[in-house]
């Protein structure tokens, strides 16, 4: 799979020996496939309303049956179909948000760590400011001012969660840039840009990848809590977070577990699986083992 | 008279530390002639490595060149911008071999990628052509089956092989000056001998001058044409290698040479020089060596000695005050 005897080849072998990580990977893969092939798996459209047989009334809160595997929700929509399509939305939000935060965090971390001095100071103070943002209130105010859309959620999560990546990358750069091979590259007359891109970045890719997995899990949780509070992904688009909104009603929470247990469980499962993958990656990249 | 290829004049390197600002290298001057090997010898903390790093402009962030000039091919590189130095000097006219072959190669790049880097950077050749040059250089540094090695990662090579790769990296652009900072310290003795032979042999094939930084006097005797002995950032003695070894003048040099074990005598304990190199923050007044010197005089404690000529050598010591004085600062 990788060039034989390369760093990644050894890491791959170590990863595949870690049972928990492999299970985590399999579970994650399962949800990814579910998201990709949602139209084939889901029996109904996610926003299709169902009516009570022969009446002009929504078939609300229907208990699980062969027609609706996980019953229907407060508007008479098929919970299972929404769950399947929700995987799509949830993962798309998480992945795009993590891409944004990883790019920002990596670039800022690289510049900060490599050039140090004033650049480092400016960026690190920026990190301090962003960390101090009350994210939830920020989002609630944004969603009241602007038309709520899935893109706002993505950018909001992306723009507030790059700080840990930036700090991690900066610390890694500080470590790597003192190593002999960086001095050796500089002694060959290699330009700063090339040293950063060709010598430093590939050598700190491993911790970045671990950070990406953990960041994805956190983004999923963040999306869930934002949507649960109604400032995240908006109806009728299904996401695992806004499916849990129904559970805010005491009646649903008490008597209709089929509405809120499935999205809660898949959320938990996916986040847990991704954390296992992250842990596995961290151990696999740790060449001391 | 051969051509001077590297000329360092009145170089001082200053480090900022918690306790203040200190001169790690104090007003040193020397020249390196074409196709010669100049060895800089000294204990740890003598400033020998700092000197080589200063020439390569690789000083740590808290260090800087506070005064002096460094001429490469009669051009003062300290007057150039950092990008000029990077494009025209580093890797092109001067290159460097590092002490630790285990850490001086990027672990995730293949040997070939690392060697071709400076060719592509400096000669603008295509990847394929650079690869051919790299292959050729690997052959010249005595790497067996280079076609295979060039595709391998550093951890697949032994220490000696890696040091050969380092040398290939340094020589691939045919630089005029090669700085070797203790290139054999991390290697075992048999490999050390091979690498020294190789450096010696490459010096003539590539017509390179070598600035060899080491603490190992046996290596110096093997490889150098001229020797500079450094102590506490100053040059305390210099001269042709034969004179330094046969007839050392400065008490420190004498002491250093006396510590060298020989094959002939087995008379128990090796002689040592009393005390240790004072830390940069606690250098004594006067001659830096006086607290350890067996010949110290009253004025050694307060005045710094000038540099006096003794035969082919120049010695910074009051013992030779009667001799012709060179300069007060070490030229």
Model-derived features with residue positions:
Chain A
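Transmembrane alpha-helix boundary and packing residues in multipass membrane permease domains
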Residues: 31, 110, 139-144, 153, ...
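Glycine-rich helix-loop "coupling/hinge" segments at transmembrane-helix boundaries
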Residues: 143-145, 157, 173, 222-266
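Generic hydrophobic transmembrane alpha-helix motif, especially the helices
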Residues: 69, 73, 100-105, 110-175, ...
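Transmembrane alpha-helices
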Residues: 88-104, 193-225, 274
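Transmembrane helix boundary and interhelical loop/hinge segments in multi-pass membrane proteins
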Residues: 172-181, 280-288
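Short hydrophobic alpha-helical segments within the ABC transporter permease transmembrane module
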Residues: 82-84, 126, 169, 173, ...
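Gly/Trp-centered helix-boundary motif
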Residues: 1-102, 106, 110-111, 117-118, ...
């Amino acid at each position: 799979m990788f060039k034989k005897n390369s760093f990644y080849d050894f890491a791959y072998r170590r990863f595949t020996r870690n049972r928990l990580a492999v299970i985590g990977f399999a579970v994650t893969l399962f949800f990814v496939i579910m998201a990709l092939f949602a139209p084939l798996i889901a029996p109904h459209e996610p926003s299709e309303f169902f009516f009570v047989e022969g009446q002009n009334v929504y078939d609300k809160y229907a208990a699980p049956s062969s027609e609706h595997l996980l019953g229907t929700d407060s508007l008479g929509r098929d919970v299972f179909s929404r769950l399947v399509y929700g995987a799509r939305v949830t993962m798309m939000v998480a992945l795009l948000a993590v891409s944004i935060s990883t790019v920002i965090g990596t670039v800022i971390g690289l510049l900060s760590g490599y050039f140090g001095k004033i650049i480092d100071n400016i960026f690190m103070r920026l990190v301090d400011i962003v960390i101090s943002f009350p994210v939830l209130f920020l989002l609630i105010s944004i969603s009241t001012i602007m038309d709520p859309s899935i893109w706002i959620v993505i950018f909001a999560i992306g723009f507030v969660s790059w700080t840990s990546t930036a700090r991690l990358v900066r610390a890694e750069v500080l470590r790597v840039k003192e190593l002999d091979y960086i001095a050796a590259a500089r002694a060959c007359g290699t330009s700063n840009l090339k040293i950063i891109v060709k010598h430093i970045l590939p050598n700190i890719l491993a911790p970045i990848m671990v950070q990406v997995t953990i960041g994805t899990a956190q983004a999923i949780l963040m999306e869930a809590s934002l949507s649960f509070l109604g400032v995240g992904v908006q109806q009728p688009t299904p996401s695992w977070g806004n499916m849990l909104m129904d559970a805010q009603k005491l009646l649903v929470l008490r008597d209709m577990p089929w509405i809120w247990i499935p999205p809660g469980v898949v959320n938990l499962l996916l986040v847990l699986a991704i954390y296992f993958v992250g842990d596995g990656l961290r151990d696999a990249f740790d060449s001391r083992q | 008279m051969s051509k001077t290829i590297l000329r360092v004049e009145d170089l001082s390197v200053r480090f900022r530390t918690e306790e203040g600002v200190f001169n790690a290298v104090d007003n040193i001057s020397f020249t390196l002639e074409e196709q010669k090997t100049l060895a800089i010898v000294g204990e740890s903390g003598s400033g020998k490595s700092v000197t080589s790093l200063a020439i390569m402009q690789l000083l740590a962030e808290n260090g800087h060149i506070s005064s002096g000039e460094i001429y490469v091919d009669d051009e003062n590189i300290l007057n150039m911008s950092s990008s000029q130095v990077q494009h025209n000097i580093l890797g092109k006219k001067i290159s460097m071999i590092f002490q630790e072959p285990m850490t001086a190669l990027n672990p995730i790049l293949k040997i070939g990628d690392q060697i071709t880097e400076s060719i592509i950077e400096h000669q603008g050749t295509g990847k394929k052509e650079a690869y051919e040059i790299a292959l050729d250089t690997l052959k010249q540094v005595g790497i067996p089956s280079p076609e295979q090695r060039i595709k391998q990662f550093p951890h697949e090579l032994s220490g000696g092989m890696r040091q050969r790769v380092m040398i290939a990296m340094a020589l691939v652009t045919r630089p005029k000056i090669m700085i070797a900072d203790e290139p054999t310290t991390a290697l075992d003795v048999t490999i050390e001998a091979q690498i020294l032979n190789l450096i010696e042999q490459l010096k003539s094939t590539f017509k390179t001058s070598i600035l060899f930084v080491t603490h190992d006097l046996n290596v110096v005797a093997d490889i150098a044409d001229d020797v500079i002995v450094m102590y506490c950032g100053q040059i305390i003695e210099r001269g042709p290698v034969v004179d330094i070894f046969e007839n050392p003048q400065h008490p420190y040099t004498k002491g250093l040479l006396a510590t060298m074990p020989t094959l002939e005598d087995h008379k128990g304990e090796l002689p040592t020089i009393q005390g240790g190199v004072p830390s940069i923050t606690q250098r004594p007044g006067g001659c830096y060596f006086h607290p350890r010197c067996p010949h110290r005089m009253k004025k050694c404690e307060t005045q710094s000695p000038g540099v006096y000529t003794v035969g082919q050598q120049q010695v910074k010591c009051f013992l030779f005050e009667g001799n012709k004085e060179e300069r007060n600062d070490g030229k």
